[in-house]
């Protein structure tokens, strides 16, 4: 597959992106220059990354250029089915994508994968390639409960799978971060179950990617505080989004994602807690509210590009403000 044909998986190539920016004028993106030649020593202790899922409609080069011009420190790159890099092409495509991201002056502190355990398709090829490129972390997860058997028994069955993944991570010197989700049958939604899976593991190789919004969905009054305290010793990455409760078309109460600062998540308290814990690691911005399909990782979007850019710029500014107020900026 040629590079051009492979890039046509996305809705916009670099040439088309630059034409769009030129036609839209300087208002399309803020005038932030690319910081060429970023080194590990110059990266912030909490690099603020765009989750590349929301830029699936851009090819690697315009995606990286957009992230840099908007002011992000880095990229959390999707290396999974439907992502910027497909698992079956990781050895060919991830080095190219990583090079483009780094040439744009961005950090690549992590990738998001579909890996659940060592038996996941292409798991070892992904880890081998990620390690060779000097990417230190990857997002892992996806365990779910079934109706068969007790929850303690199911957790006991998961522990050997986590231990096996730990050994593969040790081999490649990588840290897997389990992403926390809310919802029925999600392992990790209650947080205490995830603690039982990671508490005896080496945090160099097995850790947590804590999503404070999902934690607030599950326990909005005080439980999110308890789960933060419980898992912070194992937390190597954090994901940020916001929500409020609303009735859906059937009259049922559901979490409704919204721009940062317009929902229920207490970011000021959360970042103060992370400051107290001396947290360092990648922070990933997730934008799950309606953005013409960008929120779902679609490869074409139904809104103007500027709508997505404005949303990312607004949420990023709020993150920067909160981090600075907490002494983390």
State what each model feature region is.
Residues 16, 21-31, 62-64, 81, ...:
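Active-site acidic/histidine proton-transfer and metal-coordination neighborhood
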Residues 70-72, 76-81, 106:
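Short, conserved active-site loops that position catalytic residues or coordinate cofactors/metal ions
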Residues 82-86, 146-150, 217-218, 293-294:
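A short acidic, helix-capping loop that chelates divalent metal ions and anchors anionic groups
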Residues 46-52, 75-77, 108-113, 138-140, ...:
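Hydrophobic faces of well-ordered beta-strands that scaffold small-molecule active sites
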Residues 51-55, 78-82, 113-116, 143-145, ...:
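Active-site beta-loop-alpha junctions enriched in small/polar residues
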């Amino acid at each position: 597959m040629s590079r051009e044909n492979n890039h046509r998986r996305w809705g916009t190539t670099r040439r088309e992106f630059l034409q769009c920016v030129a036609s839209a004028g300087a208002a399309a993106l803020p005038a932030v220059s690319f910081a060429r030649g970023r080194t590990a020593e110059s990266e912030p202790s909490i690099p603020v990354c765009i989750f590349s899922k929301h830029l699936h409609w851009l090819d690697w080069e315009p995606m990286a250029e957009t992230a840099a011009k908007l002011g992000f420190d880095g990229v959390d790159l999707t290396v999974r089915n439907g992502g910027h890099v497909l698992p079956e092409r990781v050895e060919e495509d991830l080095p190219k994508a990583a090079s483009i991201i780094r040439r744009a002056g961005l950090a690549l502190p992590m990738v998001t994968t579909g890996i659940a355990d060592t038996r996941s398709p292409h798991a070892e090829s992904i880890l081998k390639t990620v390690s060779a490129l000097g990417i230190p972390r990857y997002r892992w997860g996806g365990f779910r409960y079934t109706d068969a058997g007790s929850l303690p028994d199911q957790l006991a069955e998961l522990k050997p799978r986590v231990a096996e993944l730990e050994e593969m991570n040790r081999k490649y010197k990588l840290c897997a971060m389990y992403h926390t989700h809310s919802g029925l049958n999600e392992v990790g939604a209650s947080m205490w179950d995830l603690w039982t899976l990671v508490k005896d593991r080496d945090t160099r190789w097995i850790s947590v990617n804590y999503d404070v919004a999902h934690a607030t969905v599950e326990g909005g009054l005080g439980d999110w505080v308890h789960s933060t305290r419980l898992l912070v010793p194992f937390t190597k990455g954090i994901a940020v989004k916001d929500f409020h409760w609303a009735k859906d078309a059937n009259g049922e109460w559901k979490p409704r994602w919204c721009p940062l600062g317009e929902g229920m998540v207490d970011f000021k308290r959360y970042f103060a807690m992370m400051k107290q814990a001396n947290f360092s690691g990648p922070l990933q911005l997730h934008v799950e509210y309606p953005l013409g399909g960008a929120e779902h990782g679609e490869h074409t979007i139904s809104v103007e590009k500027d709508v997505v850019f404005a949303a990312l710029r607004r949420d990023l500014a709020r993150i920067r403000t909160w981090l600075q107020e907490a002494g983390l900026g």
